[in-house]
């Protein structure tokens, strides 16, 4: 940001928040509505984005949080396992042109019924990659709590395997 490069931030939920939200849904019902489930488990990203934006504004960097429906980021497929199909760029481009840093929720989008949907676990990384692709970003830098790319979340699945080499196209799958 200080170097005057245009930056887009994509945030996941803070550590443990998504798992806590999933646990809360299970306490309510073992047959939770998939649409409501996605609405609940995607709320951690909203909190993170607002906190990041608040901090950036506090230190003098113009920013605001963007929820997936505000961008919008369109998805297709089942709840809990949707995939990004399109991202409308105009609002974000206009905000960047005004000198702002957009902080966009990862892990989520909106479907054809205008309902929030979530991507699979690790979806914030996938969101960042797709946003980088749509905006033709020079780079996509991912900061994460694990070193490297794994077949699944190594914090949840002990048998997750680290992938030594992966193409940009494979990351988008």
Where are the predicted features?
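Nucleotide/pyrophosphate-binding catalytic subdomain
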Residues: 1-173
